[in-house]
């Protein structure tokens, strides 16, 4: 009878260990990312397009947000985002990056009646439990438009201490496998 009890006890321990490991894996540390976007005051600087963002750390790991407004628009119901002279604020949770945000890819989908958008700057803050808070400012000063110079719907700003090209080749990044686009 004793060996059967040992097998039952070991089986119970195995089940408890498995459940605990799964529970801990699902409890991945999240950070709160807040984006401050300033639209230029130039005539027709505002847009009705959907704006997405990717922020990278120095290793090339990233989080991506397909639609900033849907993900975490904080300006209230009925507010018209990305209008001339506005400072728009977006905030939401996503997995913490291994190091502070240092690069930005800001993209317009070019949709809507007024697709051109002039961006002054973007500021990104990050805060999380047991994670170091960080702040990064990106001077954009560029049109995101297909009919105005530089004729691009994306703006990339890299303030990283090392080249992202060198870092993207880093092997073994679990974050790159689990993150990609959030919304």
UniProtKB/Swiss-Prot annotation:
CDD domains (UniProt xref): PLAT_plant_stress
Classification via InterPro entries: PLAT/LH2_dom (IPR001024), PLAT/LH2_dom_sf (IPR036392)
Occurrences of domain PLAT (ranges): 31-158
Residues of the signal peptide: 1-25
PROSITE patterns given in the database record: PLAT (PS50095)
Cellular location(s): Endoplasmic reticulum
GO (cellular component) term, any one: vacuole
Key word Nucleotide-binding present: no
Annotated keywords: Endoplasmic reticulum, Signal, Stress response
Primary localisation category: endoplasmic reticulum
Phenotype on disruption: No visible phenotype under normal growth conditions.
Induction of synthesis: Down-regulated by salt stress.
Organism superkingdom: Eukaryota
Pfam families: PLAT
Keyword set includes Magnesium: no
Entry function: Involved in response to abiotic stress.
Protein name in UniProt: PLAT domain-containing protein 2
Organism of derivation: Arabidopsis thaliana
Protein encoded by which gene: PLAT2
